[in-house]
């Protein structure tokens, strides 16, 4: 078996954050070392030439466990220029997603030449609990062709001092959940069922379980692993919207991690990230039914209807009660969505388009990226 791991990162601040926190967590015994003991591992890093030295000296530890390849933006074509030139002439607030998409496509094109290969797409600030990568491999050995998981976003300014005091010691899952609970970013906090300032774009709904953890229902988990298929390479949106569902056509081939005990990971973002967001409506059944019609595909239901348990301390009775409530809530959302679709007039061109996006194959899904390209021609 083979694994080809992807990350794209550039600039001193971001590279040093990657090696100090993300890479340090990945070098825990149950992560890359466990993977490299049972499979061939290539770790492909996309960056610019000016950033190459910032990976030192920590990258030498990774080279003992995996083949490490650097691919430079200066050597990649984007339209009629080098990708590095496109980066320098683009809006810095949105360029990361474009770079990630283009470089991950390049990574997948390189990997498709290898047999028995699985792709692992990582963000440069993913911090994993020890044993996470081993669990991904365990599920692949059992026959799963893809692995999905959802991260907890942390406030960078608060979490970094804590993580710095702990790493490179391996992080336990419960330890990382507690860090997530105590230093959670305002963005996921706005997605709790009882949030005082609800999100305008509720991609997940979270439920507190006292001080023992929380439960999350999520539409768009991250594609942590998938076996290569030609249909995946030319995805258009950000990778969490469609890659997993292009990777597997049969839901049983996909493993969705529903317990932090098996795999836990966090992402660190500045507190100012999405800091100017306005408050949305409370996530009532009707609000969420409209959200699923206009912002998801029916196959995302696979994730949303299966709550994820983030466990900091045991309380089986409390977790089961919240999970039952979360499942009932999700079931009601989709029932209401069916009723709303039945009420809309068939001649409505806008509704017809979104009904196809929601009910059709994943290739028909109008993601935010596709919507932004089509907004001038979409029916009003």
Name each model-derived stretch:
Residues 46-117:
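Active-site-proximal specificity loops/subdomain of glycosyltransferases
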Residues 357, 362-380:
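Boundary detector for helix-to-coil junctions that initiate low-complexity/charged tails
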Residues 10-12, 50-52, 125-127, 152-155:
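Short, solvent-exposed loop/turn segments at secondary-structure junctions
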Residues 1-78:
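N-terminal anchoring/stem segment of glycosyltransferases
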Residues 85-87, 91-97, 103, 107-108, ...:
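Conserved catalytic core of nucleotide-sugar-dependent glycosyltransferases
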Residues 112-129:
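Short beta-strand-to-loop acidic/aromatic patch adjacent to the donor-nucleotide binding site
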Residues 214-365:
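Long C-terminal appendages of very large multidomain proteins
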Residues 7-9, 13-22, 28, 86, ...:
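Secretory-pathway lumenal glyco-enzymes, predominantly type II signal-anchor Golgi glycosyltransferases
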């Amino acid at each position: 078996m083979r694994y080809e791991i992807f990350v794209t990162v550039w600039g001193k601040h971001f590279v040093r954050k990657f090696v100090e926190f993300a890479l340090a967590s990945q070098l825990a015994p149950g992560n890359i070392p466990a993977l490299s003991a049972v499979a061939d591992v290539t770790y492909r890093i996309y960056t610019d030439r000016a950033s190459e030295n910032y990976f030192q000296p920590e990258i030498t530890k990774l080279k003992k466990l995996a083949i490490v390849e650097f691919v430079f933006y200066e050597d990649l074509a984007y339209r009629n220029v080098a990708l590095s030139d496109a980066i320098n002439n683009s809006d810095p607030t949105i360029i990361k997603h474009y770079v990630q998409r283009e470089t991950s496509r390049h990574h997948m094109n390189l990997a498709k030449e290898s047999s028995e290969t699985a792709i692992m797409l990582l963000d440069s600030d993913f911090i994993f609990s020890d044993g996470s990568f081993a669990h991904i491999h365990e599920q692949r050995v059992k026959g799963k062709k893809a692995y999905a998981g959802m991260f907890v976003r942390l406030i960078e300014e608060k979490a970094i001092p804590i993580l710095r005091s702990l790493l490179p010691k391996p992080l336990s899952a419960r330890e990382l959940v507690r860090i997530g609970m105590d230093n959670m970013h305002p963005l996921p906090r706005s997605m709790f069922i009882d949030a005082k300032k609800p999100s305008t774009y509720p991609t997940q709904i979270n439920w507190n379980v006292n001080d023992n953890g929380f439960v999350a229902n999520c539409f768009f988990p991250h594609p942590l692993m998938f076996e290569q298929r030609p249909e995946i390479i030319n995805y258009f949106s950000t990778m969490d919207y469609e890659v997993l569902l292009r990777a597997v056509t049969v839901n049983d081939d996909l493993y969705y991690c529903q317990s932090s005990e098996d795999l836990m990971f966090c992402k660190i973002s500045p507190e100012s990230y999405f800091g100017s967001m306005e408050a949305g409506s409370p996530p009532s059944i009707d609000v969420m039914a409209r959200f699923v019609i206009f912002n998801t595909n029916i196959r995302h239901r696979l994730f949303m209807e299966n709550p994820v348990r983030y466990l900091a301390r045991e309380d089986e009775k409390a977790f089961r009660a919240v999970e039952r409530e979360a499942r009932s809530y999700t079931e009601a959302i989709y029932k209401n969505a069916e009723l709303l679709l039945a009420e809309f007039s068939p001649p409505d061109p806008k509704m017809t388009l979104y009904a196809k996006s929601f009910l059709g194959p994943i290739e028909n899904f109008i993601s935010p990226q596709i919507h932004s390209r089509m907004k001038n021609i979409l029916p009003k």
